[in-house]
Amino acid sequence: MNKEILFPNMSRSLHLFFLVFVVSVLFHAHDVNATTYVTFNDGRLYVFPDTCLQMMTQDEGQISFTAQDGTVYSYPLASIASIEEQLSKELPTFTSFKFNNKYNYQVITDAVGTITDDKVNVTVAGIGKRLTSSFTLSDENARAYVDGKEQESKVSRLRFDNNRTYVVGYPGDMILTAQPSGKYSMLPFGRTYTVNVDYLTDHSTSVPRIDINTVGSVNITSKIEYVDAEIIIDGAGVFPSMTDSVKIRGRGNTTTWSSNPDSKNPYRLKFASKVKPLGLTKGKNWVLLANKAKGSMMTNAIGMKAASLIGTPAVNHMIPVDLYINGTYKGSYNFTEKVGLSNNSVDLEDETTAVLLELDKYYDEAETQKFKTLSNSIPVNIKHPKFDEDSTMLTMTLIKNRFNQFVTCVLTGNDFSKYVDMDYLARYLMANEIILNTEIIHPKSLFCYNANLLDDSSKFCFGPVWDLDWAYGYNTTNVTYYVHNATADFYNWPLAQRYFIRGLRYGADTGQRLFGLWKDFMGDKLDELCEFCQDYYRYAAPSFANNKAAGLDNTNYAAQAVQAAQWLRQRANHIYEKVKAECVYPGDVDGDGKISIADVTLLINYLLSGDADSINMDNSDMNGDGDIDINDVTSLINNLLSEN
């Protein structure tokens, strides 16, 4: 029989006659395991595998396909261009597939996939299994789908802990498919690919090892004087290895640093030229964080993951390493970038007009590098420029004046949006609030920068996020993490300097911006953060065991990984409900702070026209079901009548 039914030169009536004839032939000659391909006049292709069908019928100019669950799909024969039992249409393909580190915070180097027939294999070096794929297709009109959902290159994010099935096809092409529930539905049709991701961390038995051997085996006892050394990094099969010369000294404050060389101290590393240790972005200056407090080994890694998901600037990477100095094991550390104006931290085009400030009660810079604000005497360290070292066009007076203007505006309750990047501010506050990082309230380690202080329109940007071991409910009373204070009010924390942070949170339009960020975060991003607790623990566990064996920390980190995810989820849900209650006023469609007949009119106009520019979508969803329909209009009218 004729496998392709297409009669482009026939009249409409003759075309229909032959379609009816061929359909009749198909009914009688249909193979048990055949597939029927229906092409419509508009170019859409619908595919019906025989294994999914009870029957196929034709009556009164209609063709109907009855699925195994009884669902009937009927189409007018007049809308059909052809019916075939073989696919004559060429399907689009993947031409490239990779995980670009630009869109994947945890992927150290681009992971390029190998495409062989219907398989894509990718090897990834990085901690965490949710990834954003970058791909190209053979036809610009084609699309890629996973589980029926269109995937956007460089945007869509999935968890790749198991094989993922992609469908590459054209919009509108569908296939009848059996669902796990026993139901049948139409899903995108196209070429099917199986994407397999091999994580190097799954095969590792240890984290990277860093050996630092000082010249003459001298001890490192100063936070000021550098010691010359050789550094040997073994990437342990996951990250690149390297050997180089380096300068090393101590770092940190009085609670983290000890002049006793046997202590688990934090260190600062400085290379003669820019290098890429462990494959990270090139830079001269790096840090070894000791995570000295009991139970703190995952605090910085989890916090930086949160910051990356929320989108704060210049997020640090936290790679667990085992550190040896002059052959002696020092413990499990985090290797990370040093916060500063540099291409591996805050990367700016011109540093001569830029300033990086740290609000910190330790106030430990030289007198020429620090000041206190006129309002509230907030201690400010000028981290860049170093006036006696850096090339700069700025002066101490200019820096003080500009920052004082900003702080005074905040503390007097005025609109400070002309001084600060409001988007970065909201992201910075959210990242610290979700982990309850009370350090920034003191303030300690609160960084902000301005790219061009000579330009009055250049704004202060809050970030990078830093120093996250006094967070997650940990304090001098509750010396445990991820147990206490999951519902604590961050902005009413009992510290005298909280008024600056409160002013930032409750001033300008910060609240509405936070609500938008929280709406975006709840769901996949929160899931990814909670999953990361387990992903990070699994990779770092051998190092935690080494640290414990050395008598440095006996915390049960397997249990803590579970507690951390639970604590974060509880806290996120609590904060989101508070922010939503603050920002959503059901019925206030026009956002003027009250409910009136004008709101009813706007909502009806939206339903008729689809024009959402003049309405507040959140306030319009009266019943909170995620859809705006006639039920919301009814609820709004009832509310309005009850108020009157």
Which residues does each PLM region occupy?
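Bacterial N-terminal signal peptides
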Residues: 15-26
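Regulatory N- and C-terminal appendages and interdomain linkers associated
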Residues: 91-106, 182-245, 538-584
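Internal "kinase-insert"/substrate-recognition segments embedded within catalytic cores
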Residues: 212, 270-276, 290-292, 311-316, ...
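Conserved oxyanion/phosphate-binding beta-strand-loop segments in alpha/beta enzyme cores
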Residues: 227-290
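Acidic, divalent-cation-chelating loop motifs in proteins
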Residues: 435, 584-590, 617-627
